[in-house]
Amino acid sequence: MTGTESQATAYVTLAADHAHELEIKRSRFIAYLVRTDTEDAARAALAGLRKQHHDARHHCSAFMLGPDRQVQRSNDDGEPSGTAGVPMLEALAKRETPSGKADLSDITAVVVRYFGGVLLGAGGLVRAYSQAVSTALDGAELVRRQRMALFGITSDHADAGRLENELRSGGTTVLGTDYGPTAATLRVALPDGPDIVPAFAERLATLTAGRATALPGGVEWVDMAFGVAP
């Protein structure tokens, strides 16, 4: 693994975009949560909401991107410095997910404010923007994003069905089986990690009496519902 690759093997993100509105002292705070995996996508989401709510006073934003949450940005969009974007970013960063950790990422939060005529003060703004994002997160559907190592296993046609059944019964994700003229290739995915792959290779050798080997096919990030084993 190079220094530019992610150290994380799993994180949590949105299963679907979500929005929620709060009214605080006659100001409307509409919080949008959008799944984004690049800065360009995050800025495009913000631009779209600016256009949609062109008559609003403020369009404050915060986003966290990448499996390691290595990209974090926030913007107050005209609110007093530090009263909007930073509290929104902190609400994303500190949110504990169903994984039991604060590992939310690939998410952009935009809070659109329609000013109601009552000044909230710096403390009131911090609370309002933080609450807007936190309340929206309460109603958002989340999903676990798991890094999977892909492998191809070559087997005789006669053994392929049995091997597939035994792998599935042991909890291995079998993506499919391709039958060629002389052999079958099982495509499998394993949670990526230093201990899992060697253990699988040992299990495969036992199942096939050493006749099959797993050829690496790269890695892929996969959405997985909570409660479903990878």
Mark where each language-model region is.
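Helix N-cap motif at beta-to-alpha junctions
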Residues: 38-39, 156-160, 189-197
